[in-house]
Design a protein with these regions (language model features):
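C-terminal helix-loop subdomains that flank or include functional centers
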Residues: 269-293, 311-314, 318-475
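A general structural signal for short secondary-structure junctions and capping/turn motifs
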Residues: 94-99, 130-133, 151-153, 225-229, ...
């Protein structure tokens, strides 16, 4: 329970914060204590989902195209993969690793005698490692809140705790965080079934290091929105020989400056009048006198805060640029990003993304090998029908980027290479099966040849009968 409490108190708040920034609940900008408290003024809280943009882009780039698993002929492995939607599972795991820096997969053998994979929530799952030079997992823990009915028929929130080791699964009775754990049931298992996927060796999410920049961008955009709103409420300033709160005004008449109570009352009246002027967007200023004893001019006009458009917009642009730069995520809205860039130029523009993806994929591939190793262990214990050695598997990741395949093929053909027509047909719009196009063209050519032979009177009896034109007699 100490380890669960440690995870709940020390790790879960960080993971929850990362989840909030992914979902657009940027905690810094929406915290009431971090913004203006002035009544009567705009207080917009503009939230920008950079976290979601970064995580979704990195995930789509790396695993948007399905991971290809190359293996020898193995019907049992094909059966297992057909029973699991591994494309979706890989996407969920990669997204969790990108968001939280870690992801968890649980593998079990179902009632259908097939191994199944489930994605666990990183906010309620952790793995305990040994103290070896190369630390190995010794226990996986999952704790999640459930609602239970108490003795007074009232619903209570309690934690359902599960643990796994290499040979035992334990389920505990619902309990509170500070209560004793009581075993509900135990089962014997034959493999450590929980896999921890790491985003990097530090288990840091892709947008975690730019959260301070996201907070600054939120604040800058919010301040701009506040200014644009308050700009419509310009303050009227009247300067002249008027009775205001200044010394010498009629408010001072009959007031003994040495009387503390009267001074406090006068101060309160001044504050009330200042508030009234502020609420009315009006400022009364008493005119003064020049060195020659002449009264200064009387005037009236509106004042408002000056807005440095160029400086403010440049500041926000720098923040947005730094967010993309330090997260290795290209800004797809940048008009200089795409244009008519060649394939090589585009590769340079996303070089940071490609390098980051290489690191992330290496870590993810370790988890994939563990997945099939666990499946092999469970299969060996149950049926021994799996013939593939997990260590012989090859995983291929393909960048999910737009490519100009037609131009590439054109350049290859110009260089003297020959490309099969059936291969080219796959680039036609709405074509899913290039082979069907090839077969259709072959049928059309055959029909044209037959019709030509019929027209020239050289068709065979079979061609004429198949054509349905006429029947000939054989002498």
């Amino acid at each position: 329970m100490k380890l669960i409490r440690h995870h709940h108190d020390n790790q879960k708040p960080r993971l929850q914060m990362l989840d909030d920034y992914y979902q657009g609940f940027n905690s810094k900008i929406i915290d009431p204590s971090n913004r203006r408290q002035e009544n009567g003024k705009a207080d917009h809280r503009a939230v920008h989902s950079f976290g979601k943009y970064i995580a979704d882009f990195q995930t789509s780039f790396s695993v948007g195209n399905a991971i290809n698993v190359k293996h020898d002929e193995d019907e049992r492995l094909d059966e297992i993969q057909d029973a699991n939607d591994y494309d979706s599972i890989n996407n969920e795991l990669f997204l969790d690793a990108t968001r939280y820096g870690r992801a968890y997969e649980y593998i079990y053998r179902g009632n259908d005698d097939i191994e199944h994979s489930v994605v666990f929530d990183p906010l309620e799952t952790f793995v305990i490692y040994g103290l070896q030079v190369d630390p190995q997992p010794i226990m996986a823990v999952r704790y999640h809140l459930i609602e239970v009915l108490g003795d007074n028929n009232q619903l209570m929130s309690k934690y359902r705790i599960e643990t796994w080791t290499a040979d035992k699964y334990t389920l505990y009775q619902p309990t509170n965080m500070d209560s004793q754990m009581i075993v509900d049931k135990q089962e014997t298992i034959f493999a450590f079934p929980v896999i921890e996927y790491k985003n990097n060796r530090f288990r840091i999410g892709d947008f975690e290091n730019v959260i301070p920049l996201i907070d600054l961008y939120d604040a800058a955009q919010s301040d701009t929105a506040n200014y644009m709103t308050d700009l419509n409420d310009a303050m009227l300033v009247i300067k002249g020989d008027i009775d205001t709160l200044l010394q010498g005004s009629s408010m001072m008449q009959g007031i003994d400056p040495n009387d503390e109570d009267q001074a406090k009352k006068m101060a309160k009246n001044k504050l009330d009048m200042l508030k009234s002027m502020k609420d009315a967007n009006m400022l009364l200023l008493k005119s003064g006198y020049t060195a020659n004893g002449q009264q200064t001019n009387v005037d009236a006009g509106y004042i408002h805060k000056e807005y440095d458009v160029n400086g403010t917009e440049s500041y926000k642009s720098r923040l947005a640029h730094d967010i993309h730069k330090f997260s290795h995520t290209p800004d797809l809205t940048d008009e200089n990003f795409a244009g008519n860039s060649s394939g090589v130029a585009m590769q340079y523009k996303v070089l940071g993304t490609i390098e980051l993806a290489a690191t992330k994929r290496k870590q993810f591939q370790k988890g994939l090998f563990e997945r099939y190793e666990i499946i092999a262990q469970l299969e060996k214990k149950a049926s021994d029908r799996l013939v593939t050695d997990p260590r012989s598997l090859e995983f291929t990741f393909r960048d999910n980027m737009p490519t100009d395949d037609v131009s590439t093929i054109s350049e290859v053909v110009k260089a003297g290479a020959q490309v099969p027509q059936e291969y080219l047909y796959q680039f036609l719009p709405n074509v899913e099966d290039p082979t069907a196009i090839t077969e259709q063209l072959a049928e059309e050519r055959s029909e044209q040849i037959k019709q030509s032979r019929v027209n020239y009177g050289v068709a065979t009896d079979k061609e004429l009968n198949d054509d349905g034109s006429q029947t000939t007699e054989t002498e």
